[in-house]
Amino acid sequence: MATETAGAVVESSSAATVPSPAPEAGSKHKLERKWTFWFDNQSKPKQGAAWGTSLREVYTFDTVEEFWCLYDQVFKPSKLPGNADFHLFKTGIEPKWEDPECAKGGKWTVTSNRKANLDNMWLETMMALIGEQFDDAEDICGVVASVRQRQDKLSLWTKTAANEAAQMGIGRKWKEIIDVTDKIIYNFHDDSRTRSSKSRYSV
């Protein structure tokens, strides 16, 4: 069952718990690039553990059919415990500030108080990413769904924070995709490292 599979991933944070998508008859629909799901469970941190030690690479896919199988079985934020994250990033990019592709980047963030709404925005964003719907798709690293006790959030990570034109275009397109009317903000990863809450751009 999908719920059992999701539970197994949440409990063990191991790629070994995710079954390979079953082969389907006929030709598969290849994506423009490979994408990788990651899972980070911070709900039970080990004492003295460094940030990022609970981050696990879970599954890499490159077809539409694999994506839907994985999403249906496992990757819905509403199934996560508090203080856990799902990530979908381009293969080869780790969802860390330290990754060379992310180091000079930043993120657009939207918050949600409803799990169903978070699930919907997460799905719409993932479909837009794997479907290459952004004009500046090469500047996008991936998306993170974060479940927290007070308020959940979705963050779209990009590569070149200093490129205001690219980030504004991505932000406007993302708002359209997830059907959000409230203002969303963009933060540089450099500011987050220094614990600065300053937002650089907004749409």
UniProtKB/Swiss-Prot annotation:
Q: Where is this region: Disordered?
A: 1-27
Keyword Ion transport in annotation: no
Q: Which GO terms describe its cellular component?
A: cytoplasm; eukaryotic translation initiation factor 4F complex; nucleus
Q: Where in the cell is it found?
A: Cytoplasm; Nucleus
> Any keyword Disulfide bond?
yes
Tissues in which the UniProt entry reports expression: Expressed ubiquitously with highest levels in young leaves and roots, and lowest levels in flowers.
Gene Ontology terms describing biological process: defense response to virus; regulation of translation
In this chain, composition skew of type Low complexity spans 1-25
Q: List the disulfide bonds.
A: C102-C141
What are the binding positions for mRNA in this chain?
47-52, 79, 97-98, 148-153
Q: How is it modified after translation?
A: According to the redox status, the Cys-102-Cys-141 disulfide bridge may have a role in regulating protein function by affecting its ability to bind capped mRNA.
Coiled-coil region list: none
Q: Which InterPro entries match?
A: TIF_eIF4e-like, TIF_eIF_4E, TIF_eIF_4E_CS
Q: Which UniProt keywords apply?
A: Cytoplasm, Disulfide bond, Host-virus interaction, Initiation factor, Nucleus, Plant defense, Protein biosynthesis, RNA-binding, Translation regulation
Q: What happens when the gene is disrupted?
A: (Microbial infection) No significant resistance against peanut stripe virus (PStV). Plants lacking both eIF4E and eIF(iso)4E exhibit an increased resistance against PStV.
The GO terms describing molecular function are:
RNA 7-methylguanosine cap binding; translation initiation factor activity
Similarity comment: Belongs to the eukaryotic initiation factor 4E family.
Known function: Component of the protein complex eIF4F, which is involved in the recognition of the mRNA cap, ATP-dependent unwinding of 5'-terminal secondary structure and recruitment of mRNA to the ribosome. Recognizes and binds the 7-methylguanosine-containing mRNA cap during an early step in the initiation of protein synthesis and facilitates ribosome binding by inducing the unwinding of the mRNAs secondary structures. Key component of recessive resistance to potyviruses such as peanut stripe virus (PStV). (Microbial infection) Susceptibility host factor required for viral infection by recruiting viral RNAs to the host ribosomal complex via an interaction with viral genome-linked protein (VPg).
Q: Which PANTHER family match?
A: EUKARYOTIC TRANSLATION INITIATION FACTOR 4E RELATED, EUKARYOTIC TRANSLATION INITIATION FACTOR ISOFORM 4E-2
What subunit structure does UniProt give?
Answer: EIF4F is a multi-subunit complex, the composition of which varies with external and internal environmental conditions. It is composed of at least EIF4A, EIF4E and EIF4G. EIF4E is also known to interact with other partners. In higher plants two isoforms of EIF4F have been identified, named isoform EIF4F and isoform EIF(iso)4F. Isoform EIF4F has subunits p220 and p26, whereas isoform EIF(iso)4F has subunits p82 and p28. (Microbial infection) Interacts with the potyvirus peanut stripe virus (PStV) helper component proteinase (HC-Pro) in the cytoplasm and with PStV viral genome-linked protein (VPg) in the nucleus; these interactions are possible in susceptible hosts but impaired in resistant plants.
* Protein name according to UniProt: Eukaryotic translation initiation factor isoform 4E
Organism source for this protein?
A: Arachis hypogaea
